């Protein structure tokens, strides 16, 4: 074998080896297309599709800080200093379409902190507390709603006014477990029926009392409403299965102009005591009323007044000012006159209090 043949053979072997290695090389796959989050506008602003599903999700809530001074207009006691409180509310909403209608869920977690002046003699006068609560958690399919929510005795008529101290004269307890169905017609008419577990200690004069049912019989709430461009009128009736008494409210709202609206609400209870789930005002009856004036795009003035059968009168006014979109500052002044039978429950007949609320909503 001559040198030329040896060189040609070696070159052929190298070419063959290179071809074999090329055949065994790993080929990188083509990159997959990135699936960006899609906006879902079927249920309002802020929703997006959960990737890989047709479920729309929204994460929202608010951060709030309150500073209070003067008297406690609920109890009539002097605070003897500033009360401060903070809250972070985290809300999660979902929505999707099914063959039985729109399926929605709503949950709200509240993280609360309070630093209240104790009024005792000492170097430091503040008492602090903090806690977390699952405020709401419900499922809604069409008009059917099940879970933890606020009582239809409040929500169906539209709560009270747009003031912070709106329930100095309480119109019933709030949070409850419930099963409700709301019918909504195309002509402005709607109706609701609800079976409720009874309120917890979110409401009213009695403070820490829970008004849960003590057997299988639920509380029952029913209501009718008619709404139009002029305003609305609504009425609700509630039966308290624990004390076997009933309470009712009727409310009317009128839009005078696009900027100015007024409302009036009257209530009656068959049990003349605030120690109950629904009729938590003093005596047989109570009345609330108020107005709202949207002075500018940023500033709104709110006023509310209330009076009950036992002689308590409560008046509150505020100005809600939106400094920038999503950030609102609300200074508020409240006055309570404890007259009639309420005089025996408080140390002072008159209470003046103020609060400033800072809230960032998102």
Swiss-Prot record:
Domain of life the protein comes from: Bacteria
Topology relative to the membrane: Multi-pass membrane protein
One Pfam family this sequence matches: Porin_2
UniProt keyword list: Cell outer membrane, Ion transport, Membrane, Porin, Signal, Transmembrane, Transmembrane beta strand, Transport
Entry GO MF terms: porin activity
UniProt cross-references to SUPFAM superfamilies, sorted A to Z: Porins
Additional information: The pore formed by Omp2a is larger than the one formed by Omp2b. Omp2b pores have optimal permeability to allow growth and protection against harmful compounds. The larger pore formed by Omp2a may be advantageous for intracellular growth, when the bacterium is competing with the host cell for nutrients whose concentration is particularly low within the phagosome.
Domains: entry comment: Consists of 16-stranded beta-barrel sheets, with large surface-exposed loops, that form a transmembrane pore at the center of each barrel. The pore is partially ocluded by a peptide loop that folds into the pore lumen.
Role noted for this protein: Forms passive diffusion pores that allow small molecular weight hydrophilic materials across the outer membrane.
Protein name in UniProt: Porin Omp2b
């Amino acid at each position: 074998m001559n040198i030329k043949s040896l060189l040609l053979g070696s070159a052929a072997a190298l070419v063959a080896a290179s071809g074999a290695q090329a055949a065994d090389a790993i080929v990188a796959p083509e990159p997959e297309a990135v699936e960006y989050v899609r906006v879902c506008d079927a249920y309002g602003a802020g929703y997006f599709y959960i990737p890989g599903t047709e479920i729309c999700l929204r994460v929202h809530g608010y951060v709030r800080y309150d500073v209070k001074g003067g008297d406690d207009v609920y109890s009539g006691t002097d605070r003897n200093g500033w009360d401060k409180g903070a809250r972070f509310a985290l809300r999660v909403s979902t929505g999707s379409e099914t063959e039985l209608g729109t399926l929605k869920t709503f949950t709200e977690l509240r993280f609360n902190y309070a630093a209240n002046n104790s009024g005792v003699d000492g170097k430091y006068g503040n008492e602090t507390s903090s806690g977390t609560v699952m405020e709401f958690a419900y499922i809604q399919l069409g008009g059917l709603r099940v879970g933890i929510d606020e009582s239809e005795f409040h929500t169906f008529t539209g709560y009270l006014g747009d003031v912070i101290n709106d329930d100095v004269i309480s119109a019933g307890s709030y949070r409850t477990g419930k099963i409700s169905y709301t019918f909504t017609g195309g002509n402005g008419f709607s109706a609701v029926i609800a079976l409720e577990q009874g309120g917890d200690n979110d409401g009213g004069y009695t403070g820490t009392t829970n008004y849960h049912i003590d057997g299988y019989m639920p509380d029952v709430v029913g209501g009718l409403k008619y709404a139009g461009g002029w305003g609305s009128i609504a009425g609700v009736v509630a039966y308290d299965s624990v004390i076997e008494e009933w309470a009712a409210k009727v409310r009317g709202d009128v839009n005078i102009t696009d900027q100015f609206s007024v409302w009036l609400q009257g209530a009656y209870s068959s049990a003349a005591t605030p120690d109950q789930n629904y009729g938590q005002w003093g005596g047989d009856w109570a009345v609330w009323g108020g107005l709202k004036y949207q002075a500018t795009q940023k500033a709104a003035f709110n006023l509310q007044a209330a009076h009950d059968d036992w002689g308590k009168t409560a008046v509150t006014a505020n100005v809600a000012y939106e400094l920038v979109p999503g950030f609102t500052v609300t200074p508020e002044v409240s006055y309570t006159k404890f007259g009639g039978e309420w005089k025996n429950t408080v140390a002072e007949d008159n209470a003046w209090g103020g609060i400033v609320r800072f809230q960032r909503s998102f």
